[in-house]
Amino acid sequence: MNVLFLPQSGALGPSSRYRVYQLLPHLRAFTSEVSPAIDDDLYRAIYLTGHGSKLAALYATWKRRQADWRRVRDFDVVFVQKGFFPGLYAGLEAAMAAQRPLVFDFDDAIWLPREGGSPMLRALHRERAVQTILHRATAVIAGNDFLAEYARRFNANVTVVPSAVDVARYPRAAGSTVVGWIGSRTTLPYLKPLADVFRQLGITPRVIAAGTPDFPADFRPWRLETELDELAQLGIGLAPLPDMPWERGKCGVKILQYLACGIPVVASPVGVQRDLVRHGVNGFLAETPEQWRDCLKQLLDDAALRQRLGAAGRALVTERYDVSVAAARVAKVLAASAQTKGMTGKL
């Protein structure tokens, strides 16, 4: 079976890396071709350095996807990751779905305009465009139950495949007391409300990110080639999130990364984070500043507790959130979709 994978970006983009590229070695039963909408150079310019134009990304996506549309009949199944222009336009996906079975995968609440995003894109955002893709797809893969619940309003053939990590690649953390966070330029603001907690505890958090924080931090620039080594130096992982609709759709990859290294986590009880972090078992859930302070202090003061919670976290990820588990589920969806002759799962 021949599958055309259409990710949003090259492997430098985290969503495409976790939802497509890391699965490919585990999908060798399929003949596959990967056609990213934008390459790593353009992704780096726009999302890592902040010097590129998102209009350039839209233009590159349009050119690439028009070329892909002309050749979809050469494949048995088309796998679309997150859409070409989520919330803006769904015409190309609909045209592809009319020619070949189309599997649509998404790991964010893309039907919502993102807070803090481009004012122009927010103004142009149309939820109907996302609904059209969900309606036309042969099958939908959602990164968590919150996303799946929305998708099932428009398509009966929805499978939940949580985001996963390749546990074997993650080194075990050394057991330090370094309190740290890993994330993107756009998610750095999630960490800032904890500034007073850090000050009260005398902590300077280590921040591994593409953007520079505007609060006191031990900043380490994020690089794909050094990411795992940087993670392994942490002793406690942070995952604060505001309880908002967009954040409820997130898939908790940073928590999976911490746990894969055997690092205990303190996280906000928002969305999938409530499922990944088992309070007192592999980390702690904290809502108020007082809870954050108390949970962090407890972990900082007790090396045995950090070790016990970290071991439980790595065991959980190995059993339920390893890339091999996710790839097996995706393989079933692809195989079933190829047998549908282009039928959709629309309601």
Where are the language model's segments positioned?
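Conserved catalytic-core segment of nucleotide-activated headgroup transferases in glycan assembly
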Residues: 11-26, 35-36, 164-170, 174-232
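C-terminal alpha-helical cap of glycosyltransferases
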Residues: 323-347
